[in-house]
Amino acid sequence: GNPIKNDKGWKIEKWENVLKIVNGKNQKKVENKTGKYDIFGSGGKIGKADDWLVKENSVLIGRKGSINKPLIVKEKIWNVDTVFGLEPDTDIINYHYLYYFCCFYNFEQLNRAVTIPSLTKRDLLKIDIPIPPLELQNKFATRIEAIQKLKFRKLKSLEKTENSKIIQKFLALK
């Protein structure tokens, strides 16, 4: 069912009951080109760090700027101060389900700024989220991962085919 419309009538919880929001911090003190952890801004990966703030299997959402573009992180990461880390309580909610909920949720409705879109932790914690049985969430996650792997293989195959065509055209010019 649609996680926003909740047409299945699942129990509704506030975010404050099913996840932890991790505030980002300035990365200057932990930044290191050979660091073990990725640094994420609201637009994606921006560097490496020696420390982490957000645990693996979490979701990132922009606090300022790109507020409607969630990201999944499967490893521990450092999030900068323009990004919130969402760490789901894994006894209640699967991170894939949380990610897709965030993809469909309109964070613009919580926007408090006029020029640069901006979200507050207090408003986010009050978001209602339908909670399907964890077993269904996990089945959904398994399907999504299988689809993503298939998509990746198909893209690699297309890329290989395209590269082969380019090489053939180049060799035909000689």
What is each stretch, according to the model?
Residues 1-41, 126-174:
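Non-catalytic DNA-recognition/assembly elements of restriction-modification systems
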Residues 17, 34, 55, 105-107:
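Exposed boundary/loop context
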Residues 41-105, 112-124:
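A short beta-sheet element
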Residues 59, 108, 117, 139, ...:
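General helical secondary-structure elements
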